[in-house]
Amino acid sequence: DYVLISSSAVYPETLPQPFNERQPIGKNSIWGDYSSGKVGAEVCLTSRYPNAYVIRPPYLYGPMQNLYREPFVFECAELKRKFYIPGDGEMKLLFFHVEDLCRFIYSILKQHPDNHIFNVGNTQPVSISTFAELCYRAAGAPLEKVFVKDHPNQRDYFSFHNYEYLLDVSLQNEIMPEQKDLYCGLKESYEWYKSNKEEVRKKPYIDFIDRNFQ
């Protein structure tokens, strides 16, 4: 059996949401070359092995996360910094724990479902404001929020694109209806982060905040 861990970035941002597995795939301008690469990988694999399984996750998280996404929030929490949140904080993010990803791969290899393309992800999205609250809570730190209303590029100071999208994960839920609680997963992520900070690929968000928002 072939299983490709693709990405929800294969859905062009212009498609109706929530994205579902029946929609056409193509380049998403938010994700650029990353999106194009994932689309190309899907086309290549499925043209050669039509019975391969393709899995399209949203933001993956959990222990061994070396991208400076939730680790950025953890660092701010440890430093007891205010946390700068884009807009009104209501933009939604969709996550999926790496352990749930592994459980799902195991399930499809064991069950061999008729469907071969699956969106995966938590059933419920979370606002960026609530996400910050959960990360600070996982780190055991109080949170003071600052909402940024007038800066054009949130990636200067925040670790997620200004892009909200939702996935239809009903096919996933027929096979694996339960996902790890987001707070519990973030707590696991923080425990890994504490001992592995040197593994994280940092970006200069804090420097930008100190130079522009203080």
Go through the PLM ranges and name each one.
Residues 153-178, 196-198:
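Conserved C-terminal active-site "lid" loop/helix of NAD(P)H-dependent oxidoreductases
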Residues 74-84, 91-126, 133:
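Alpha-helical substrate-binding/gating segment
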Residues 182-214:
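Amphipathic terminal alpha-helices
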Residues 51-93, 135-136:
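NAD(P)-dependent short-chain dehydrogenase/reductase
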Residues 7-32:
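Active-site "gating" loop of Rossmann-like NAD(P)-dependent oxidoreductase/epimerase domains
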Residues 29-55, 69:
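Active-site Tyr-X1-5-Lys
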Residues 62, 86-91, 118-126, 150, ...:
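Glycine-rich Rossmann NAD(P)(H)-binding loop
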